[in-house]
């Protein structure tokens, strides 16, 4: 196995909070998958939840080397937790097609947050 891509992102949680205060759930609707949306709606810390998902998706887009463009959208990257609570990544649509084209067989996600920041790193393996 070889590393195909590495991406890291850091998000200031207060900026996400300000966007939500200004525009309601528009950012969440753009960023979250349907499954993530269902969690976000009832989450005890929805701003923090959204900030962490945003960080993972930005990191994934960087790992793929594309950014969010050319048919890729935030909601095509879905963050979920495995049975041990470890964050994982599931792809849909154009993101899944790109992963297949590049030969991605494994994706590693690490996620951390503190009072003011959320950060994530994604590694793609062939």
Swiss-Prot record:
Mg(2+) binds at residues 9, 58. GO terms for cellular component: cytoplasm. Belongs to the P-Pant transferase superfamily. AcpS family. It holds the Pfam family ACPS. It is found in: Cytoplasm. Its EC number is 2.7.8.7. Gene3D superfamilies: 4'-phosphopantetheinyl transferase domain (3.90.470.20). Its cofactor is Mg(2+). Keywords: Cytoplasm, Fatty acid biosynthesis, Fatty acid metabolism, Lipid biosynthesis, Lipid metabolism, Magnesium, Metal-binding, Transferase. It catalyses: apo-[ACP] + CoA = holo-[ACP] + adenosine 3',5'-bisphosphate + H(+). It is an enzyme of class 2 (transferase). It comes from Enterobacter sp. (strain 638). One of its GO terms (molecular function) is magnesium ion binding. One of its GO terms (biological process) is fatty acid biosynthetic process. Transfers the 4'-phosphopantetheine moiety from coenzyme A to a Ser of acyl-carrier-protein. This is Holo-[acyl-carrier-protein] synthase. HAMAP family: AcpS.
């Amino acid at each position: 196995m070889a590393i195909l891509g590495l991406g890291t992102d850091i998000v200031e949680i207060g900026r996400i909070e300000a966007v939500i205060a200004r525009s309601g759930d528009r950012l969440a609707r753009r960023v979250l998958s349907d499954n993530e949306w269902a969690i976000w709606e009832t989450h005890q810390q929805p701003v923090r939840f959204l900030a962490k998902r945003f960080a993972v998706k930005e990191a994934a887009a960087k790992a793929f080397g594309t950014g969010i463009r050319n048919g890729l959208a935030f909601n095509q990257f879905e963050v979920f937790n495995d049975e041990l609570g470890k964050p994982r990544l599931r792809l849909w649509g154009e993101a899944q097609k790109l992963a297949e084209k590049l030969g991605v067989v494994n994706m590693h996600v690490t996620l951390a947050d503190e009072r003011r920041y959320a950060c994530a790193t994604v590694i793609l393996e062939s």
